[in-house]
């Protein structure tokens, strides 16, 4: 390496943010892909939906970014944005649950780990729930469960299709049984939605695990997933220790689940809106003006 090349490399390193799978943790002008190592200009990465242009790795994005990808501009109307979790069990491990809630709220600007509302997608109505992994690992507590249940009930009344973007570590242990009962509550609401022959599509993103996978994430009429998303119930290590055998390298990935029939289609983030639009049209969803 020449002296000029060495200085150029050093200068470039000064502008490369922290290497992380979550680009939100990087504050530099440049971001290094955690999958292939390609360095990209942060602004270009964002304009490409936070998908690496070299290897198509899907970086984690927040709930607002998800909504902007799916919903028509300025069409999203949020519901139940005032609901906030409490600490009924006075749970404490190394820290109190109340402190963890406060930290997550201050760090994300969210009240809890999901945003719900009604929007349009290419002029067709859609009920939308988007989980946010930044808030306590996207864990499902009583507020998350209540907000998702309410938006499903709203969709059932209004005869709207619904999409739930899943990103979760599972049930929120700090709420105990109050968290676990959300699995049944949401599933019951979805059954009523299905009884009216309305369309429900979950989008499984990285990661979707635990009680979310064991309930509404797998109840869709069509189950969509992002490429290489981690999808499962228990962790890989737990399963290997239980079965006492080595699992395939691609076990619990979207591709593995597609091959084995648990996922219907893997959708690149850049094609998500057009894919959802096509599915809605095939299922006869009319636009807001009444046309097909």
Swiss-Prot record:
Cofactor note: Binds 1 zinc ion per subunit.
Cofactor(s) the protein needs: Zn(2+)
InterPro entries to which the protein is assigned, alphabetical: AcCoA_carboxyl_beta, Acetyl_CoA_COase_Trfase_b_su, ClpP/crotonase-like_dom_sf, COA_CT_N, Znf-ACC
Binding site for Zn(2+): 33, 36, 52, 55
ZnF C4-type span: 33-55
Subcellular location: Cytoplasm
Gene Ontology CC terms: acetyl-CoA carboxylase complex
Cross-referenced PROSITE patterns: COA_CT_NTER (PS50980)
Example of a GO biological process term: fatty acid biosynthetic process
Pathway annotation from the record: Lipid metabolism; malonyl-CoA biosynthesis; malonyl-CoA from acetyl-CoA: step 1/1
Cytoplasm in keyword set: yes
Enzyme nomenclature, EC number: 2.1.3.15
Gene Ontology molecular functions: acetyl-CoA carboxylase activity; ATP binding; carboxyl- or carbamoyltransferase activity; zinc ion binding
Source species, domain of life: Bacteria
Catalysis performed (reactions): N(6)-carboxybiotinyl-L-lysyl-[protein] + acetyl-CoA = N(6)-biotinyl-L-lysyl-[protein] + malonyl-CoA
Subunit structure: Acetyl-CoA carboxylase is a heterohexamer composed of biotin carboxyl carrier protein (AccB), biotin carboxylase (AccC) and two subunits each of ACCase subunit alpha (AccA) and ACCase subunit beta (AccD).
Family: Belongs to the AccD/PCCB family.
Descriptive protein name: Acetyl-coenzyme A carboxylase carboxyl transferase subunit beta
